[in-house]
UniProtKB/Swiss-Prot annotation:
Organism per entry: Methylorubrum extorquens (strain CM4 / NCIMB 13688)
One of the Pfam families matching this protein, by short name: HSP70
Protein name: Chaperone protein DnaK
InterPro entries documented for this protein: ATPase_NBD (IPR043129), Chaperone_DnaK (IPR012725), Heat_shock_70_CS (IPR018181), HSP70_C_sf (IPR029048), HSP70_peptide-bd_sf (IPR029047), Hsp_70_fam (IPR013126)
Domain of life: Bacteria
Region ranges (Disordered): 598-639
Classification via HAMAP family: DnaK (MF_00332)
PROSITE patterns noted in UniProt: HSP70_1, HSP70_2, HSP70_3
Classification lineage: Bacteria, Pseudomonadati, Pseudomonadota, Alphaproteobacteria, Hyphomicrobiales
Length: 639
């Protein structure tokens, strides 16, 4: 059995880790970095870029560069948060055929699961390169507050990337696993996880290798991206005030502003002031315009104060659901890059009444925890038991549109719960089971996960038939629902799939696309390599012809020059095999030149050989003597 890897699929950055013996290890990517930007881009010629290469070209290619895609995963196009996101990103968010939010580039639509799969593929390749063997299984993390549709979409992304997702694990729980793996002391901890796009807080009890989640809460649309956007809004407002030009309509300018905002935010975690300089940000009739202004930490904190405060209410709810007070928390663990901000640390300290623990790397701890869970599933990590919870209540719509809960939030998973319902009308022969997830009292205010019909119920007065509805939540937090007519034992079971969501056929098509793209990427890489070889050979051959061309016949020299011309012509095309053939022809034609170079070097070396011989002849007149430098003090000692 191959290694199971742990992947933190983040909004801003992703990270992959693996167990090496009893210790988890974060794996560096091809660029030598321990985290990879969760960014995917398509170039003019259709090449796909993932990670740092995609991030580097974002400024010049904003409409084809997809970032923060995790905010769209498992969401419908009509979701208010999707509509909000449309105004924040330079790329196009379109309605998918299934009603979900998809993205579009050059007229081609991609599901968020598909874009996420490209990042997961990069993580998979990073691990394979390090391990030297194929990787087919993974544990992938998600925000604790992700609903069923978002979890299912993440699992689909893994499948598209060629990974069997053995477990979907909550990010704060993964962080707690990493934090508590070597800790001997039992206690209650709070994991405060403020990442690039999402916020979670979980309360856990840890002791004797048991990690029990008592409660979780959060906001799946609150993170570092929002902090960056506040700085961008401030910069555009200031520029408009000074220059009278609105930069919000200029996608290239916005992308530059976004990068500058992120950089300024990071700098303000250690400095009290930073300078933002963006020359040639735009131009008008009077000429080019430059943006230059100073941003203080105090000003930045005032811009984002409400975002920081928004994290406190979920903390309050999580403590209440866990039945503990802030003073009963033994340790507060900070996770996610945004927790490096001093103001965030200050607010957390004020709320929990204690200095937060900063001993874990907030960018890597989640991937490390995922690797630990992978080790548990593989049997490499012993004596660790993880008990997680479902973040949101689950139930069905009953008469009058009421939301009837079957499983309450923060119930330990896996879990199974049944309840008997009946018909609302006389002689009703079918019922529609509509499954919702959320905390509101009316079904319509919660998230519709899916629906199905149970048909063939024998005619009977209302309230007589007995329909047993069973909810089954697996360890991934993914829901299965069964409805059974107890009179006929007729049963209907579904794995809940969001009213949108990807069908098995969609996923299969995307898997095939991913495989085809992998083949295309391989061919593109091969083409670059053979072109490089061809160009190097031309350069080396031309240099040799300049030096030794007079040592070969005119016919041989002519053959070499023809072969160079033919290879140059081939290099202008895209035919790798053709370039290989012409490279080979040039190598064959250059053989005579190689012989001439070898002969010339032999001739040049001959006088040197004679000289060596004459030295040997005089050897008898030379007296060999060993000598040694002796320190003055050493000499006195010896005397």
């Amino acid at each position: 059995m191959g290694k199971v890897i742990g992947i933190d699929l983040g909004t801003t950055n992703s990270c992959v880790a693996v167990m090496e013996g009893t210790q988890p290890r974060v794996i560096e990517n091809a660029e030598g970095a321990r985290t990879t930007p969760s960014i995917v881009a398509f170039t003019d010629d259709g090449e796909r870029l993932v990670g740092q290469p995609a991030k580097r070209q974002a400024v010049t290619n904003p409409e084809r560069t997809f970032f923060a895609i995790k905010r769209l995963i498992g969401r419908t196009y009509d979701d208010p948060l999707t509509q909000k996101d449309k105004g924040l990103v330079p790329y196009k968010i379109a309605r998918g055929d299934n009603g979900d939010a998809w993205v579009e580039a050059d007229g081609k639509k991609y599901s968020p699961s598909q874009i996420s799969a490209f990042t997961l593929q990069k993580m998979k390749e990073t691990a394979e390169s390090h391990l030297g063997q194929p990787v087919t299984q993974a544990v992938i993390t998600v925000p604790a507050y992700f609903n069923d549709a978002q979890r299912q979409a993440t699992k689909d992304a893994g499948k598209i990337a060629g990974l069997e997702v053995l477990r979907i694990i909550n990010e704060p729980t993964a962080a707690a696993l990493a934090y508590g793996l070597d800790k001997k002391k039992a206690g209650t901890i709070a994991v405060y996880d403020l990442g690039g796009g999402t916020f979670d807080v979980s309360i856990l009890e840890i002791g004797d290798g048991v990690f029990e989640v008592k409660s979780t809460n959060g906001d799946t649309f609150l993170g570092g991206e929002d902090f960056d956007n506040r700085v961008v809004e401030y910069l555009t407002a200031e520029f408009k005030k000074e220059q009278g030009i609105d930069l919000t309509k200029d996608k290239l300018a916005l992308q530059r502003l976004k990068e500058a905002a992120e950089k300024a935010k990071i700098e303000l975690s250690s400095a009290t002031q930073t300078e933002i300089n963006l020359p040639y940000i735009t131009a008008d009739a009077s000429g080019p315009k430059h943006l230059a202004l100073k941003l203080s930490r105090a000003k930045f904190e005032s811009l984002v104060d409400d975002l920081v405060q928004r994290t406190i209410e979920p903390c309050r709810k999580a403590l209440k659901d866990a039945g503990v007070s802030a003073s009963e928390i033994d340790e507060v663990v900070l996770v996610g890059g945004q927790t490096r901000m001093p103001k965030v640390q200050e607010v957390v300290k004020a709320f929990f009444g204690k200095e937060p623990h900063k001993g874990v790397n907030p960018d890597e701890v989640v991937a490390i925890g995922a690797a630990v869970q992978a080790g548990v599933l593989q049997g490499d990590v012993k004596d660790v038991l993880l008990l997680d919870v479902t973040p949101l209540s689950l139930g069905i719509e009953t008469l009058g549109g009421v939301f009837t809960r079957l499983i309450d939030r923060n119930t330990t998973i896996p879990t199974k719960k049944s309840q008997v319902f009946s018909t609302a009308e006389d002689n009703q022969n079918a019922v529609t089971i509509r499954v919702f997830q959320g905390e509101r009292e009316m079904a319509a205010d919660n998230k519709l996960l899916g629906q199905f019909d149970l048909v063939g119920i024998p005619p009977a007065p209302r309230g007589m038939p007995q329909i047993e509805v069973t909810f089954d939540i697996d360890a991934n937090g993914i829901v299965n629902v069964t409805a059974k007519d107890k009179a006929t034992n007729k049963e209907h079971q579904i794995r809940i799939q969001a009213s949108g969501g990807l069908s098995d056929a969609d996923i299969e098509k995307m898997v095939k696309d991913a495989e085809a793209n992998a083949e295309a990427d391989k061919k593109r890489r091969e083409l670059v390599e053979v072109k490089n070889q061809g160009e190097s050979l031309i350069h080396a051959t031309e240099k040799s012809v300049a030096e030794y061309g007079d040592k070969v016949s005119a016919a041989d020299k002519g053959a070499i020059e023809s072969a160079i011309t033919a290879l140059r012509s081939a290099l202008e095309g895209e035919d790798a095999e053709g370039i290989k053939a012409k490279t080979n022809d040039l190598m064959q034609a250059s053989m005579k030149l190689g012989e001439a170079m070898y002969a010339a070097s032999q001739t040049e070396g001959a006088p040197g050989a004679d000289g060596a011989a004459s030295t040997d002849e005089k050897k008898d007149d030379v007296i060999d003597a060993d000598f040694q430098e002796v320190d003055e003090n050493e000499r006195k000692k010896r005397a």
